[in-house]
Amino acid sequence: ISTENMIYTAQKLQDEYDLLTQLSTGVQMGSAMAGNTKQQMNALGTDIEILKDRAEADRLRDFIISTKASNHRHDEVWNYNPVRFFKIRIPKERERYETRGKQKGNIKECFHGSSSSNCLSILKTGLVIPPVNAPHVCGRMFGTGAYYGLSSTKSGRYSLGSWGGKRSKYDNIFLFIADVALGKYYTTYDSLPSGTPRGYDSIWAKAGQSLYNDELITPYLENQTLKYIVELRP
């Protein structure tokens, strides 16, 4: 992440969120905001549009609702449901996945949650893997890597700030949907702070013993690509 993308102040945090909101609104308004939207898209360098395929939107809605984890039934995140779907393509990230990651196989459709203030930078560059000593990093039960969930509410709790992240003052949250090529994955039922073992492409941390929900972790960014960003509201 370059210096100009880093968030230093509360005002900068709010500015990042406001720009994401403007982007979302601009796409929805279509021709009425065509010029402004085009400028915003060019600035991002990312292809983003409202998902017009009704069948695919219905599939994604069912995917999100059907994967709510029962252990989150009494959490705030349980009440959040999808209201808008955006199709995204981050050119360099997608090319990296198509040429170097996809062929590893064992592809799973997964969720990634992040606070609204982080969504714009993710849309610009894709996910990044923070260094081990990075401050304010949630999780890391399975070492350094990109973390994904198979439960919408598990990932949604990160979007909501339930794990200690910054909560938005608005009542909406955003959830990414990605394809992750697990390749040769290492199965564990407990934490693995040392990370992905040598010779493996990823970790599949499975629920049932010490874990409530499955998590998928890969230390290789070419193994994943973000396909959609979904807005959810209670």
Q: Model-found features: residue ranges?
A:
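Intrinsically disordered, low-complexity terminal and linker regions
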Residues: 1-118, 219-234
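Segments that shape or occlude catalytic/ligand-binding pockets
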Residues: 11, 35, 96-234
